[in-house]
Design a protein with these regions (language model features):
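Soluble or luminal CAZymes and related metallo-dependent hydrolases
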Residues: 104, 150, 212, 268-271, ...
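Rossmann-fold NAD(P)H-dependent dehydrogenase/reductase core
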Residues: 5-15, 22-248, 324-328
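C-terminal amphipathic/interface module of NAD(P)-dependent oxidoreductases
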Residues: 303-328
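Intrinsic disorder
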Residues: 99, 134, 266, 305-309
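Context-dependent free N-terminus signature
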Residues: 1-3
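Mobile gating loops/cap/lid regions near enzyme active sites that modulate substrate access
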Residues: 251-252
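C-terminal helical subdomain
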Residues: 236, 260-300, 308-312
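Alpha-helical packing segments of well-folded alpha/beta enzyme cores
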Residues: 60, 108, 216, 272-276, ...
């Protein structure tokens, strides 16, 4: 990887320009999302669903007949009512969760197990880009927790509590980013350690945590499908640059410019949701243990993310961190 490639997502300006450029690149679609790709009778959970991409995904899945559970930190119940109106589907439910808090994740899983399991589709969408480092209740760095580690905890709790459909292969979808290609290497010695940073470092760390997430998705697929049989379909994707509120913590001086650029060049959440809905609903992915999309095009993930040794190391460190936090 060249130095210029490494810098693509390392600051807000280069990340924005890269996003705009990627939108204009010619793409070969993996397939087409058809009106007949229905989800009637399926139970879907979308996290981070109160706004932006997550809200659009929840609405899109509801329109296809799914029973939709929106797991959110805010927007309860008004966002669920809005999805009902937009989709014409009344089978919409909202659950509270704060993905920066391990205890809140545990409570969410308890509610899912009692009232909503088995899940057929899970969309892990929640993510943040904070303007500076913040500590969680457990003393972790918040973006590390929300953008990666919460997914590890959440997925393993769902699996331990048998919250997925065990008859038909469920689909687990991670909203990742092409910025996962930017980090030069893993920083295993720093894993889980709290470190101070300001907005200038946020974009770089965002890409690093997306690398952790994409590596986790690859390793999860290998562990859930050990003998070549697809028991779970694990998908990851970059929806491209989205006109959402993920940059809401940017310095105030930049917000008017960002809003203008996002509005002109970036995709609306409803358009950006199409590849997520495609992965959730299309028969094109039946029987597939893993796939990665950029927009609507199939791509291979970065070799660092697909390397089984890196996957095993990430899993080992994540398990050790979870065990340590449980004994505190």
């Amino acid at each position: 990887m060249t130095n210029s490639q490494q810098q693509k997502y390392n600051n807000p300006v280069s990340a924005t320009l890269t996003g705009i450029r990627d939108l204009f690149r010619k793409q070969i679609p993996a397939g087409t999302l058809n009106p007949t790709d229905r989800l009637d009778g399926k139970t879907v959970l979308v996290d981070g669903a109160s706004s932006g991409l997550g809200f659009a995904v929840a609405t899109g899945l509801a329109r296809r007949g799914a029973k939709v559970i929106m797991a959110c930190r805010s927007g309860i119940p008004e966002k669920g009512e809005k999805v009902k109106k937009l989709s014409g589907n009344t089978d919409i439910h909202m659950l509270h969760v704060d993905f920066s808090d391990i205890g809140s994740i545990g409570e969410l899983v308890k509610q899912i197990k009692v009232k909503y399991a088995p899940l057929d589709i899970l969309v892990c969408n929640a993510g943040i880009v904070p303007k500076q480092s913040r500590k969680t209740k457990q003393g972790l760095e918040e973006m590390f927790m929300v953008n990666y580690f919460s997914k590890f905890i959440f997925l393993n709790l769902l699996l331990e509590n048998q919250c997925f459909n065990e008859v038909d292969p469920p689909r687990i979808i991670f909203v990742a980013s092409e910025s996962h290609r930017n980090p030069e290497k893993f920083q295993w010695d720093e894993f889980g350690k709290y470190k101070e940073y300001q907005i200038g470092k946020s974009i770089e760390l965002y890409g690093y945590y997306k690398l952790l997430l994409t590596t986790f998705s690859c390793e999860l697929s290998r562990r859930l499908n050990p003998n070549g049989e697809t028991r779970y379909s694990v998908f990851s994707l970059c929806p491209g640059p989205v006109n959402s509120n993920i940059a809401r913590e940017a310095p105030k001086i930049f917000i008017p410019v960002l809003k203008l650029v996002f509005g002109i060049f970036f995709k609306s959440p409803s358009k950006a949701a199409i590849p997520v809905v495609y992965l959730a609903a299309s028969h094109d992915f039946d029987g597939k243990p893993f796939d990665y999309l950029f927009l609507m095009s199939r791509k291979t993930v970065d070799e660092k993310a697909s390397d089984p040794e890196n996957g095993r190391q990430l899993w080992k460190l994540s398990e050790a961190l979870q065990e340590r936090l449980q004994t505190v």
